[in-house]
């Protein structure tokens, strides 16, 4: 296993104007970025970064800073597969030459970090790429963008960093991997940490959810404890349906059966046959009830995979005209999946969950939660309830979104797919 340094050392080095290396999850980019605080940018630091990286230097910024400086998205519909929020490139208006030299880019970086800067201090386009970090940092999105802003803030500096991916010296056509990054860090006296470590540190020292209420809820699947939460950054309410003891005198929080369910008014409440959401929720509650211990976390704000109820209804119109669920979203200028699992991960941790068996057919959901320090020991498939109205939707989820759904090609209306729950479960 690769030796890593402490988050405390990385924060101290950032505060002292040094660079650090941050590695993300192996199921994500699986790359190491060189990171330093933008307000500490010097020609020497920038030259070092250019020499050992791809050279595509970016400056992650807090969202409020982006708004103050008028940094608009580079493209109206973000199609980056990791959701990196690129904005229009900039140069400092004064004090630079062409904008590309290490000295010029250091000047632009420091200006972006300066709380006194205004939009008119920059020319567009330029040679530095500002990135908009998610509010909540790595707890909301486990990316290098958020890691850079978090590290700067934790060091007591302005919420602005500088990042770029380190290139492999073994194979210059690819990015450096973990073992090579450790060697590089030791050669140059740099701290090496992971985003997972940063998430764990922030989770231990900060809290971004509030437990508000708890009540007994009898359901047709048995009795649950409904625990209500609000997310501090978004003021969105979420509910965890809990069965049995998750963590306590007789339980250690391990091996918990968990369903993280995205809100779906049409499917969960109205019983729409256009999706399988309602049947998945019912199946998850039944499976947790049968086990006698587990959590069904109902995530508000996830309607239509995060695009909202009214947009979802608009996509239904497009689907009736021939588009599939992915193309309908894209045609409206919306992402195929805009959901964020960071708050859900914090709720699970607050409930005492340490390791889980995750009820899902969506491998991406596993990746979305795994980066938050929650150990997923097994992905438990949910039964598929197909019908004539949702069969195309299910096939699209399988073929274009990577969902693990079997038996769809053999479907016809008179036959239930294997594993389908009946009402007696």
From Swiss-Prot:
Alphabetized UniProt keyword annotations: GTP-binding, Hydrolase, Lyase, Magnesium, Manganese, Metal-binding, Multifunctional enzyme, Nucleotide-binding, Riboflavin biosynthesis, Zinc
EC number: 4.1.99.12, 3.5.4.25
Region (GTP cyclohydrolase II): 205-425
Annotated disulfide bonds: none
GO molecular function, one term: magnesium ion binding
Catalytic-site annotation from UniProt: 337 (proton acceptor), 339 (nucleophile)
Binding site for Zn(2+): 264, 275, 277
Cofactor: Mg(2+); Mn(2+); Zn(2+)
Site (Essential for DHBP synthase activity): 127, 165
Pathway(s) this gene product operates in, as recorded in its UniProt entry: Cofactor biosynthesis; riboflavin biosynthesis; 2-hydroxy-3-oxobutyl phosphate from D-ribulose 5-phosphate: step 1/1; Cofactor biosynthesis; riboflavin biosynthesis; 5-amino-6-(D-ribitylamino)uracil from GTP: step 1/4
One of the GO BP terms on file: riboflavin biosynthetic process
Region annotation (DHBP synthase) ranges: 1-204
Residues the record lists as binding Mg(2+) 1: 29
Similarity remark: In the N-terminal section; belongs to the DHBP synthase family. In the C-terminal section; belongs to the GTP cyclohydrolase II family.
Name assigned to this protein: Riboflavin biosynthesis protein RibBA
Lineage: Bacteria, Bacillati, Actinomycetota, Actinomycetes, Mycobacteriales
């Amino acid at each position: 296993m690769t030796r890593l340094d402490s988050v405390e050392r990385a924060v101290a080095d950032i505060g002292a104007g040094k660079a650090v290396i941050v590695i993300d999850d192996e199921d994500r980019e699986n790359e190491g970025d060189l990171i330093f605080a933008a307000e500490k940018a010097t020609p020497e630091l920038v030259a070092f970064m250019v020499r050992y990286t791809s050279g595509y230097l970016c400056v992650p910024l807090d969202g409020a800073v982006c708004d103050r400086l008028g940094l608009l998205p580079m493209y109206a519909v973000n199609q980056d597969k990791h959701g990196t929020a690129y904005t229009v490139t900039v140069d400092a208006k004064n004090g630079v030459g062409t904008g590309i030299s290490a000295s010029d880019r250091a000047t632009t970086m420091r200006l972006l970090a300066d709380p006194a800067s205004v939009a008119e201090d920059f020319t567009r386009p330029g040679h530095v790429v500002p990135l908009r970090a998610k509010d909540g940092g790595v707890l909301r999105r486990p990316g290098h963008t958020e890691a850079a802003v978090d590290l700067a803030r934790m060091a007591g500096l302005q919420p602005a960093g500088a990042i770029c991916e380190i290139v492999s010296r073994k194979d210059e056509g690819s990015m450096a991997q973990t073992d090579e990054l450790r060697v590089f860090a030791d050669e140059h006296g740099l701290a090496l940490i992971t985003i997972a470590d940063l998430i764990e540190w922030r989770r231990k020292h900060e809290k971004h959810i509030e437990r508000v209420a708890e009540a007994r809820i009898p359901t047709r699947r048995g009795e649950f404890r409904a625990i209500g939460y609000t997310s501090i950054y978004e003021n969105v309410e979420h509910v965890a349906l809990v069965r049995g003891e998750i963590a306590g005198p007789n339980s250690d929080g391990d091996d918990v059966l968990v369903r993280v369910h995205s809100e779906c008014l049409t499917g969960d409440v109205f019983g729409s046959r256009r999706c399988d959401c309602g049947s998945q929720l019912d199946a998850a509650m039944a499976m947790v009830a049968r086990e006698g211990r587990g959590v069904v976390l109902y995530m508000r704000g996830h309607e239509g995979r995060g695009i909202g109820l009214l947009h979802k209804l608009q996509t239904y119109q497009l689907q009736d005209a021939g588009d599939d669920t992915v193309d309908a979203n894209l045609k409206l200028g919306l992402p195929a999946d805009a959901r964020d699992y960071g708050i859900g991960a914090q709720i699970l941790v607050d409930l005492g969950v340490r390791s889980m068996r995750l009820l899902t057919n969506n491998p991406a959901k596993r990746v979305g939660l795994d980066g938050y320090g929650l150990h997923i020991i097994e992905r438990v498939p949910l039964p598929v309830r197909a019908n004539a109205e949702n069969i195309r939707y299910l096939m699209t989820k399988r073929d274009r979104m990577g969902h693990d759904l079997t038996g769809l090609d053999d479907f016809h209306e008179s036959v239930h797919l294997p594993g389908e729950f009946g009402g007696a479960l």
